[in-house]
């Protein structure tokens, strides 16, 4: 077999491969022999069909199958011989497929970039520290109460935070539009569920009242057919209900699995959850800074095949998350390219750090992470057991731990500054970083 490789770009390779005709003929004959043993042809006993008849009937298909298999196997042999690491499937360009002659084809593909991760010393990280103060705990209890708000019908005009039961019909240019009408919809005023002006226009309304709202859809509205257009909504208020916060009592605590210990036990459990959230938030922010630093100090070119595959994965995730009747490939690729590039580049960099420093998942840390996650459940021992009985889930935890070990490796050489902040600041989400 003859192989030659041309570097067409930094990552693209054009590999010309010539396979001896004898190898093709051997594969063709092998298939014909297998076919002859099981072929059922009128006038012949099974296994007794002349080879000339087998070739006449099945020769073309056998050759096509043989060529496909030989291309696949010879491509693999060639990349091993040339010590290439393909990123994605090759594009095959046949040059000579004529029977009795050598098979010639060209495989065009990308390879993974070869690089050494460096620049740890130039990475700066601000590592936060915080405690859960009593005031933070009290604020969280208020949030939990609000999340479990009950609504009771009130005989008064609607206010912000009231829940209204409404019927409405929306029209654009006098015509009812799809998705613009509903009956018996529950709407909390001030929730921001509806377009600007809708909820505000119902403040002061009473049960049985009808209001007409003339509103304009935002220019960036998700339904492009309605974006920027003026609509008329006729709204009938069926009921007005006011919010009632639940008392901090045994009934309320039981909703969170706390059946004993009263308010003190409930506060203890909530504090534990807040401390767990705090640890995770601090760890996540340190990790994001490290990853940003690795991106900045290790610019690498991304194989287009990997980028395309990642865009496809993000499209599927978006459809699964937001639902709807849209197909993944209907979502514009450019919506996901920055995120896809960041994920692909970081995946390559992290893999290279693991390779350079010969990192292996620390099984003690794996168990510690599983126990930390399990502590959020009422039966933590069962959760731990479930992870260790599910190899796929266990390997996912190992991957997360390995990534943490990469972060620790970088932190050993990076410039790290410790900073004490409030609980609220420590857990506050940061804006998702973008790819360069």
Swiss-Prot record:
Organism domain of life: Bacteria
Q: Which reaction does it catalyse?
A: [protein]-peptidylproline (omega=180) = [protein]-peptidylproline (omega=0)
Name listed for the protein in its UniProt record: Trigger factor
Where does the record say this protein resides? Answer: Cytoplasm
Q: Note whether Cell division occurs among the keywords.
A: yes
Q: Which EC number(s) does UniProt give?
A: 5.2.1.8
Which regions form coiled coils? none
- What's its job? Involved in protein export. Acts as a chaperone by maintaining the newly synthesized protein in an open conformation. Functions as a peptidyl-prolyl cis-trans isomerase.
Q: Which GO terms describe its biological process?
A: 'de novo' cotranslational protein folding; cell division; chaperone-mediated protein folding; protein transport; protein unfolding
Q: What is known of its domains?
A: Consists of 3 domains; the N-terminus binds the ribosome, the middle domain has PPIase activity, while the C-terminus has intrinsic chaperone activity on its own.
- GO-annotated molecular function: peptidyl-prolyl cis-trans isomerase activity; protein folding chaperone; ribosome binding
Pfam families listed in its UniProt record: FKBP_C, Trigger_C, Trigger_N
Source organism (scientific name): Pseudomonas fluorescens (strain Pf0-1)
């Amino acid at each position: 077999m003859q192989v030659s490789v041309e570097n067409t770009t930094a990552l693209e390779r054009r590999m010309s491969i010539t396979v001896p005709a004898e190898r093709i003929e051997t594969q063709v004959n092998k298939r014909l022999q297998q076919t002859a043993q099981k072929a059922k042809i009128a006038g012949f006993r099974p296994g007794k069909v002349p080879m000339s008849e087998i070739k006449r009937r099945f020769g073309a298909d056998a050759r096509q199958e043989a060529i496909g298999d030989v291309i696949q196997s010879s491509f693999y042999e060639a990349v091993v011989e040339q010590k290439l690491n393909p990123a994605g499937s090759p594009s095959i360009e046949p040059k000579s497929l004529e029977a009795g002659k050598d098979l010639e084809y060209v495989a065009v593909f990308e390879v993974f970039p070869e690089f050494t991760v460096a620049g740890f010393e130039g990475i700066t990280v601000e590592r936060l520290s915080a405690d859960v103060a009593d005031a933070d705990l009290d604020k969280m209890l208020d949030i939990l109460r609000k999340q479990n708000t009950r609504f009771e019908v009130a005989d008064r005009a609607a206010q912000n935070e009231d829940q209204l039961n409404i019927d409405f019909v929306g029209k654009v240019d006098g015509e009812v539009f799809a998705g613009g009408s509903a009956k018996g919809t529950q709407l909390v005023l001030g929730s921001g569920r509806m377009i600007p002006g809708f909820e505000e226009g119902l403040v002061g309304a009473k049960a049985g009242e009808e209001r007409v709202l003339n509103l304009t859809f935002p220019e960036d509205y998700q339904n492009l057919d309605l974006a920027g257009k003026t609509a008329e909504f006729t709204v009938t208020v069926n009921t007005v209900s006011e919010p009632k916060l639940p008392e901090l009592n045994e009934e309320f605590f039981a909703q969170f699995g706390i059946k004993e210990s009263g308010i003190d036990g409930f506060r203890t459990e909530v504090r534990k959850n807040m401390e767990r959230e705090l640890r995770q938030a601090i760890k996540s922010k340190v990790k994001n800074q490290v990853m940003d630093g690795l991106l900045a100090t290790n610019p690498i070119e991304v194989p287009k095949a990997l980028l395309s595959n990642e865009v496809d994965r993000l499209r599927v995730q978006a459809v699964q998350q937001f639902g709807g009747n849209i197909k993944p490939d209907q979502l514009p690729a450019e919506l996901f390219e920055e995120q896809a590039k960041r994920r692909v580049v970081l995946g390559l960099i992290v893999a290279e750090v693991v390779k350079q420093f010969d990192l292996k998942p620390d099984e003690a840390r794996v168990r510690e992470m599983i126990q930390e996650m399990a502590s959020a459940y009422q039966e933590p021992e069962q959760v731990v057991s479930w992870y260790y009985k599910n190899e796929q889930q266990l390997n996912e935890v190992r991957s997360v731990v390995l990534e943490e070990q990469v972060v620790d490796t970088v932190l050993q050489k990076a410039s790290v500054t410790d900073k004490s902040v409030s609980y609220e600041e420590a857990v506050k989400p940061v804006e998702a970083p973008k790819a360069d």
